[in-house]
Amino acid sequence: KDLAKQMRAAIINYTSTIGGHVGPNLGDVEALIGVHYVFDAPKDKIVIDVSHQDFVHKMLTGRAQYYLDKSKFTEIGEFTDPNESPEYDIFYAGHTSPSISLAFGLAKARSLKKEDFNIVAFIGDGSLSGGVAFEGLNNAGKLNDNFIVIVNDNQMAIAENHGSLYDNLRELRETNGQSEHNYFKSLGYDYIYVAEGNDLESVINALKLSLIHISEPTRP
């Protein structure tokens, strides 16, 4: 909790000084702390969608000084960038929806090379309506190369979300993830619902449970 508080203070100071996406980065602090606590990056691969929500990821991967030292604020990019951190930033991701397809590609390559590591795609609800996101979910659900998709369903996007997908996300929220109508299960995924994504303990417990799920060889 102290780390999350310090990170939020740094994000507010950073964005109030030079601008940037303050909301997404304040909202995913505990989620990304949990990801880096449970998974062993850079051995495990973390793909952040859009990546303007990646400040916490960068702070936890050796770049905190760029958010703490005002003289270095302009030396850090806003998006994940392999030129900036080839170990931790696998892809340059500056637009919406590709994370699931990219993670699926990593999973397929891992299988072909017979390697052993975890893969996590972190995507917001607003990005799920993108065609590339559906393509990734659809193909991965069928081909059984296990990886983890974290959906940050904060009901926030650059524009209001519309469509049947968001009706189902709302139904899942209203039923604490128990609705018999489940978009993700219909595509072949095991599903874990976390009611409070800013509760670090809940996030960590869900991520640890996800590792048990993906140990089953035929489930994404």
Feature annotation, model-predicted:
Residues G141-Y166, L172-E174:
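Mobile "lid/hinge" segments at catalytic clefts and subdomain interfaces of large enzymes
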Residues K1-Y14, F184:
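Cofactor-/ligand-binding subdomain signature composed of acidic, glycine-rich
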Residues I12-G20, S85-F91, Y189-I192:
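Glycine- and acidic
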Residues A4, H21-L143:
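Cofactor-binding active-site loop characterized by glycine-rich and histidine/acidic residues
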Residues I212-P220:
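Residue-level detector of conserved catalytic or cofactor/ligand-binding positions
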Residues K108, L112-F117, G163-L209:
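Conserved thiamine diphosphate
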Residues D49, F122-I123, I148-N152, S215:
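Short beta-strand segments
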Residues D54-H57, L128-G130, Q155-A159, Y166, ...:
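Flexible loop/turn segments at secondary-structure boundaries
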